[in-house]
């Protein structure tokens, strides 16, 4: 789906003209949608910060992240793309983006028994893998059941395999990152 005011309105369940009445600029609209997206992502991935986190919970967080990115493609693209640019003029956006990552990192740190520096490295590595999987799995959805030219060639055969068994794949990824 192409990013547009119309597609954002549809994804947000509002009329196509509503965005024009409520925001001064397109960038202000994009920032508001991205802010809301980060809040929804945080809520979907939330783990109580006072409790021990299991590997299974971290895998579930990763799956929630991926599901959000696939289901809310336009919002996700605003959250992580360049349409808004610098978040600094939008303090609520900056706070919601940081909060989303902070919950992920906090949860990871309660599972891994490492120094803060190692946790930062491992967490951004895991987040990068999960973030990358969103893009790859979105591509798998676009291809759907269409036959690949050479199914054994290229990354799509691997992507399709991962998509068919995402939970097990993420379990291995999380285990590998946490244990190394």
Indicate residue ranges for each PLM-predicted region.
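Solvent-exposed, amphipathic alpha-helical segments
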Residues: 40-51, 129-136
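Helix-loop segments that flank and shape redox-cofactor active sites
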Residues: 21, 46-55, 85
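Amphipathic alpha-helical recognition patches that constitute DNA-binding helices
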Residues: 53-60, 64, 99, 121, ...
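Short linear capping/connector segments at secondary-structure termini
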Residues: 46, 79-88, 147
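Helical hydrophobic small-molecule/effector-binding pocket
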Residues: 59-80, 127-130, 134, 138
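Helix-turn-helix
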Residues: 1-28, 32
